[in-house]
Design a protein with these regions (language model features):
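C-terminal cap/substrate-recognition subdomain and adjoining C-terminal extension
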Residues: 84-181
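Alpha-helical substrate-recognition element adjacent to the catalytic core
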Residues: 14-108, 178
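Residue-identity detector for glycine
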Residues: 7-10
Length: 181
């Protein structure tokens, strides 16, 4: 079996305790769906694709739609993910996490702990529901913080930003999500 690069993937997983609601999947765009490496070719094969979308992994759309979860954008694209990304992926409009300004105390604590700036907002948005979060900025500090601040199962999955979501990522996410449903 091939080894994952250090720090890529990984999860914090806890047992489900009678929590029956559909899990959430928080999805970043830049990195997981728009890798920073690669050929720069659109998966659609369109010649008139906007340059910033030329690396979009359109084959990920149907695979995301098949996962047993509620998809939620967790990206700086905000609502633009619904107008510019979702149609290329064949996805409907999805809920979007908004990014509130942290307090000065939160910002200092996040820097001291090494938390991704999205972590608190993702946990707040989940509101106690099980969730998976796919992002290229997740660290072990985020996994530890979520483990101690979120009561439900959570899987924080770091994607290699140069490759985007891979077959193995989809297999591991799907397996984890199916265990919850």
């Amino acid at each position: 079996m091939a080894q994952r690069p250090p720090g890529v993937g990984g999860a914090i997983v806890r047992q489900v305790s009678g929590h029956e609601r559909c899990p959430l999947l928080f999805l970043d765009v830049d990195g997981p769906l728009l890798p920073f490496g690669g050929s720069g070719q659109s998966g659609r094969g369109d010649t008139d694709v906007a340059p910033h979308l030329s690396r979009l992994r359109v084959e990920a759309g149907p695979r995301l739609a098949e996962l047993p979860c509620t998809l939620v954008w967790a990206t700086t694209w905000l609502e633009d993910a619904n107008s510019e990304i979702a149609p290329w992926l064949g996805l409907p409009n999805l809920p979007v996490v908004t990014w509130p300004e942290p307090t000065e105390a939160q910002e200092r604590e996040d820097q001291w702990l090494g938390l991704c700036w999205k972590t608190r907002a993702v946990v707040d948005w989940a509101a106690g529901r099980p969730f998976a979060w796919v992002d290229d900025e997740i660290t072990e500090a985020d996994r530890e913080w979520v483990s101690s601040h979120h009561p439900a199962p959570a899987m924080l999955w770091r994607v290699d930003a140069s490759r985007g979501l891979t077959d193995r990522d989809f297999a591991d996410l799907g397996e984890w999500l199916r265990q919850l449903t």
